[in-house]
Amino acid sequence: MSASISTQPAYDVAVIGGGLLGAAVAYGLAGLGLKTLMVDEGDIAHRAARGNTSLVWVQGKGHGCPAYTAWTVRAAEAWPVFAAELNELTGVDANYRRTGGLKFCLGDTEFESRHRLIDSIETESPAARSEMLDRQALLDIYSEIGPQVTGASYNPMDGQVNSLLLWRALHQGFQQHNGQYLPRHSVGSIRQIGNAFELVAGNETVWAEKVLLAAGIANARLAAQVGLNGGVRPVRGQVLVSEKLQSRFAVPATDLVQTDAGGLLIGNVEEDAGLDESTNIRVLSGMARRAVATFPSLESVQLVRSWAALRVMTEDGNPLYQRSESHPGAFAASTHSGVTLAPLHATVLARWIAGLEMDPAVEAFRPEQRHVH
């Protein structure tokens, strides 16, 4: 790709960021027939997807923000068709399964606290469909739970997917829709000149009519250049991986998810650690102890890997979708739910950025609307 010497935009939209959020929107934009460029730092980027357990998750989301609950429910309902579409186009099966999902509670205090949260969300948003299961009901699903387990919350819309295969399918689908991919480039500056945005990424300069910031933590650095508020901070997640298990954990939980390969992913921590991606033995030990308390049989299981990754968190934990008033054509998107919301990012959000549909659901997550939540 050669540097441009003209302000004539070579692309309809340039998407900065090639993680799950950026790739989903870019896939959708290219599918709409827009000439789309995805600029991606590549493996040096802080990939948020490395720090999650690949859940498509409804329960517990949107407390105090019914719009987020409704958005999440809508995404979960869209997942079966979305997964089938990606598979048909790319041949990549992301292994999406709607299994229902659990959040285990250890002790009465955890159960009562979770019960209050679920009741509050259900009062605000009955469509969320979460419920509490006492210990006896939970034993019908998992007879092997430990004596400390007092119950769990459950939602039938929850499920799981292989997020790495999802990422691969989105990138492959994007390029099959004639999208252009520029890897191993970090955007340093953005300027609006006339009817176009100039993006300088290393030794490359590209021009686009519109630009979407979907760069995760880097949005905080880039947003001010186009009159937007970064509004994000890094949150560290840590993951433990077990050896492949013969036994099957058919219903995933927030902190215990079995992959399609058989290994068990353990982890559901959120830490404010700046840009530190190192693991912490104290935290990992706590995660392992909780897993054994939940399923005592795991005590003899060998752990084979651990890692940490930085996830993206907005100021209030809800998605943030922005459209610049001072730089028309500039947009930004941030969320820590890139897996769950992928179907809507590829459709509704892409159409919003393309100017084809002003969906009220998207407008609800603009900064100007925060006060109504």
Q: Where are each of the predicted segments found?
A:
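N-terminal Rossmann-like FAD-binding beta1-loop-alpha1 element of flavoenzymes
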Residues: 13-37
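Glycine-rich FAD pyrophosphate-binding loop
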Residues: 31-50
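Central helical "cap/lid" subdomain
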Residues: 46, 204-249
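Dinucleotide-binding Rossmann-like beta1-alpha1 core, especially the glycine-rich loop
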Residues: 54-137, 141, 290-292
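Helix-loop-beta segment of a Rossmann-like dinucleotide-binding subdomain
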Residues: 92-105, 129-177, 269-273, 328-335
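Helical element adjacent to the flavin cofactor pocket in flavoenzyme catalytic cores
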Residues: 153-202, 206-209
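Active-site lid/adjacent beta-loop-alpha segment flanking the redox-cofactor pocket in flavoenzymes
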Residues: 245-328
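C-terminal catalytic lobe of FAD-dependent flavoproteins
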Residues: 297, 301-373
